[in-house]
UniProtKB/Swiss-Prot annotation:
Protein name: Ribokinase
Gene3D superfamilies xref list: 3.40.1190.20
Organism annotation: Staphylococcus aureus (strain COL)
Annotated gene: rbsK
Record's subunit section: Homodimer.
Associated pathway: Carbohydrate metabolism; D-ribose degradation; D-ribose 5-phosphate from beta-D-ribopyranose: step 2/2
Compartments it resides in: Cytoplasm
Keyword Disulfide bond found: no
Amino acid sequence: MTNKVVILGSTNVDQFLTVERYAQPGETLHVEEAQKAFGGGKGANQAIATARMQADTTFITKIGTDGVADFILEDFKVAHIDTSYIIKTAEAKTGQAFITVNAEGQNTIYVYGGANMTMTPEDVINAKDAIINADFVVAQLEVPIPAIISAFEIAKAHGVTTVLNPAPAKALPNELLSLIDIIVPNETEAELLSGIKVTNEQSMKDNANYFLSIGIKTVLITLGKQGTYFATKNQSQHIEAYKVNAIDTTAAGDTFIGAFVSRLNKSQDNLADAIDFGNKASSLTVQKHGAQASIPLLEEVNQV
């Protein structure tokens, strides 16, 4: 059965620079390549990934009236994303991200939130019909927390599973933590929230146990090329990553989440399989440059 997924999150226009290495303070370096603008934002990336895995995907986001995101709206339509709840506002410009990728494929990202940061609980309430009919509601932290709380409250009241990707990393209020069914941090985000640095298998377990102890039912800690560690009250497992030559890690985590929620059963009885599917999809993403441009189609993932 096809999963119905609502993504609440950011839409950005990404500007990419390819560099041999990162500059030191006060240093000027030549850029290897300056690429044209691409669609991005954690929310948009996750929506694209979910839709390309052929889940029934609705996206709640906010963009400016500046027209710079019009090409992204076309990308959403091509991906068959329900754009009924995409809001245009004159309050701020469309969000932007400035991304540098070095020779090792690692990236740094600087984000201007723009219209994303004008998302309100009222905007979310206007999308209530989509939320209550979903299997999963997914959010990140590139929109205001009150809007996320509103979405998760609606979801929980109607038996919809909530998924939080706590990125960019920041402290979370208890009001939000109490509404999370599945949390998907990376090592840095997990450490910030739990206070436990992820250095080995035991610290991964300790980290996951922290989230379980505060009432979150399912914990996934993404570990980059080391794969994903997951835990529930009944089971835990380290799922290995697929070994590939990574050239750009941009959107790898977003691809993982989109693929994961597209495959996960509502009962979560296929948790390990859904995580492996997410790992497989993200292993394709890191072999290409760009964010949404690098997110694979379901047919490509199935060929791995």
